[in-house]
Amino acid sequence: MKFPEFKDYYQQLISTSSISSTDSSWDEGNAEVINKLAQWCEDLGCEVEIEEIEKGKLNLLAKLGSGEGGLLLAGHTDTVPYDEGRWNYEPHALTEANDRFYGLGTADMKGFFAFILEAIKNINWKDQSKPLYILATCDEETTMLGARHFASNTKIQPDYCIIGEPTSLKPIRGHKGHVANAIRVTGKSGHSSDPAHGVNALEIMNEIMFALMTLKNKLVKEYHNPGFSIPYPTLNLGHIHGGDSPNRICGCCELHYDVRPLPGISLDGLDNMLRDALKEIEAKWPGRIDITPLHEPIPGYECSADSPIVTSTADICGQDVETVNYCTEAPFLQDLCPTLVLGPGSIEQAHQPDEYLAFSFIDPTISILSKLMYKHCF
């Protein structure tokens, strides 16, 4: 059988739109790209399972070989929406220019699957002793639905996992989590000349912001991980809106904030800290304060520095293992087995106009993936 060339894989992945978004006008699902991956994997001898988690939202698990343990190579098939007016290249076409592949998903991260397929083609699998798994998930860019569902329901037990997010081929063994909430204060509007006839939502929010800043300082003092460039949890007040006129008592105010917890800080524990910080204000103003998550919270993630996958992958890549501050699906897959994040392209290209992958990543990525397959499947 004649298999597609590397560039053909890449072209078809990028030209197949698979945008996920909380805005229903953008949200597309990923069925078409999953079906293409399924056919390619089957052509290479893999057993393929496809699961529809929600309508149009699919996960794919491919397995090459048999036995216990092995290696799981994982990634997401969805992309973010795009602003066409800011792109100089067609987002859903693979454009070659400036020694780069341009297109939506070239770095983040549909293109990674082309590297996996190319590495599989280049290996003689005759003496394989452990399975290779390929996981392609849905909705990483929104809810991480695919990874959450897979980690909670799968029966496979690989020895190790590599997630191919763009890390410039530097192995990543940890990152912070992300929690984002909206706090809405409902006051009572009225004319500013008589404050007693109203309840000023901005004044209540001022108390809340002071409490959050106190919590921010507490997080800095009480939690520390020297493995991170910013070694403490961060809390940021990112957006606020309230009121409509200087001579009117503010009847409503809303604040959006986020927290990036270190690995080891549980989401329940963090939520309790946030609630404790506001409990006196909530008691003072009953029924006027609502806290709503802006997305499903993501825990921090850390793979032990002593794990064999850490040392062996660092040797294969010739790079020191690092930690980062952005989020991936790693916290969920780490529940299955020791997990690293490692892939071609730069995170600086993620979610940007004219997203690209430099040609200089192509040969090293195929080489690294081939070595990882030999290391953990033979």
From Swiss-Prot:
Primary location? cytoplasm
What pathway is this protein said to act in by its record? Answer: Amino-acid biosynthesis; L-arginine biosynthesis; L-ornithine from N(2)-acetyl-L-ornithine (linear): step 1/1
Q: Which HAMAP family match?
A: ArgE
Q: Which GO terms describe its cellular component?
A: cytoplasm
The family this protein is said to belong to = Belongs to the peptidase M20A family. ArgE subfamily.
Q: Where in the cell is it found?
A: Cytoplasm
Q: Name the gene.
A: argE
Identify this protein by name. Answer: Acetylornithine deacetylase
Q: E.C. number, please?
A: 3.5.1.16
Q: What does the record note about the cofactor?
A: Binds 2 Zn(2+) or Co(2+) ions per subunit.
Annotated Gene Ontology MF terms?
A: acetylornithine deacetylase activity; zinc ion binding
Q: Where does Zn(2+) 2 bind?
A: D108, E141, H351
> Which residue spans traverse the membrane?
none
- The residues that the entry says bind Zn(2+) 1 are H76, D108, E165
Instruction: Kindly list the cysteine pairs connected by disulfide bridges.
Output: none
What Pfam family does this protein match (any one)? M20_dimer
Catalytic residues?
A: D78, E140
Name the source's superkingdom: Bacteria
